[in-house]
């Protein structure tokens, strides 16, 4: 099994887009990428725009090779309903249920996206289901909260197994801070798990200390069940990310388990462009007329 992160916050843009290849299938999970609308009162720096656009080109390139595409929920850093829709043409597309366990915002986005690919893709609801192709098994969790409650909607987690190899993609659980989000990981015991991590860049605002503490407990439990913990996305928007989960990193070293970020999985440098936005504007000044806003919330 080959696991290839194509875009991530550790690589400079908001995304968890991941390409997984087995002997039987080439799978594209969450083909989307976005930018943080505002950090430190600043819009995305031109270098962030450049990175996002480069990542999107790579996502499209790899998605063309895919036999199967998966959309775990309908935030714009996980799917793109406007561009590159040809990647879905003639493909099997497994999606989060657009009508059940979904909030109003995602319901509208899901409807729009599915109309965009209607007639060109073979769309199936994935929630709680299992699929098999040869020796490759794909299992989906029941919907779990995007975060600590239903305000941001629900996501589905993805487990892929091929023989002795296995990979689990939590999508946006923001931790996981809830037991039912962690349960799917603990039950499946994947060799490699990719987690979006606690949303510590909003600690004390939209993410509580109690949620962080619960996430650390769950991540520690997950370490007992896996060989490699890949943590990225929400956590990697915080320059202090490693301090926030120091106990998890320490445990990983103690029990000889890998705790890494997505960039390390593909031997790329850590480039937290959004978290370093203020620094980017200081190092590479931009005239106000050249600033571009990202107008969409995730």
Swiss-Prot record:
Coiled-coil region: none
A GO MF term: hydrolase activity
InterPro entries tied to this protein: RibonucZ/Hydroxyglut_hydro, UPF0173_UPF0282_UlaG_hydrolase, UPF0282_hydrls
Top-level division of the source organism's lineage: Archaea
SUPFAM superfamilies: Metallo-hydrolase/oxidoreductase
Record-linked HAMAP family: UPF0282
Family: Belongs to the UPF0282 family.
Protein name: UPF0282 protein Kcr_0286
């Amino acid at each position: 099994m080959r696991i290839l992160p194509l875009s991530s916050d550790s690589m400079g843009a908001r995304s968890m887009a991941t390409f997984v290849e087995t002997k039987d299938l080439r799978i594209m999970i969450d083909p989307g990428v976005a930018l943080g609308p505002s950090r430190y009162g600043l819009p995305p720096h031109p270098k962030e725009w450049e990175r996002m656009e480069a990542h999107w080109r790579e996502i499209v390139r790899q998605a063309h090779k895919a036999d199967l595409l998966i959309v775990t929920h309908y935030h714009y850093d996980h799917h793109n309903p406007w561009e590159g829709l040809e990647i879905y043409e003639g493909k099997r597309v497994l999606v989060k249920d657009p009508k059940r366990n979904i909030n109003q915002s995602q319901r509208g986005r899901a409807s729009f996206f599915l109309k965009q690919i209607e007639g060109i893709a073979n769309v199936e609801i994935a929630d709680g289901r299992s699929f098999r192709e040869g020796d490759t098994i794909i299992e989906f969790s029941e919907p779990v909260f995007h975060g600590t409650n239903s305000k941001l909607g629900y996501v589905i987690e993805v487990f892929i197994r091929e023989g002795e190899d296995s990979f689990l993609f939590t999508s946006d659980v923001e931790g996981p801070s809830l037991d039912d989000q962690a349960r799917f990981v603990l039950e499946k015991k994947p060799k490699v798990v990719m987690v979006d991590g606690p949303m510590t860049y909003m600690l004390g605002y939209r993410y509580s200390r109690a949620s962080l503490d619960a996430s650390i407990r769950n991540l520690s439990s997950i370490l007992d069940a896996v060989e490699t913990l890949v943590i990225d996305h929400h956590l990697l928007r915080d320059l202090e990310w490693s301090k926030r989960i120091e106990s998890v990193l320490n445990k990983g070293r103690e029990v000889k388990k890998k705790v890494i970020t997505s960039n390390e999985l593909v031997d790329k440098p850590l480039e937290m462009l959004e978290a370093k936005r203020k620094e980017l504007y200081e190092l590479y000044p931009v005239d106000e007329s050249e600033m571009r806003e990202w107008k969409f919330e995730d």
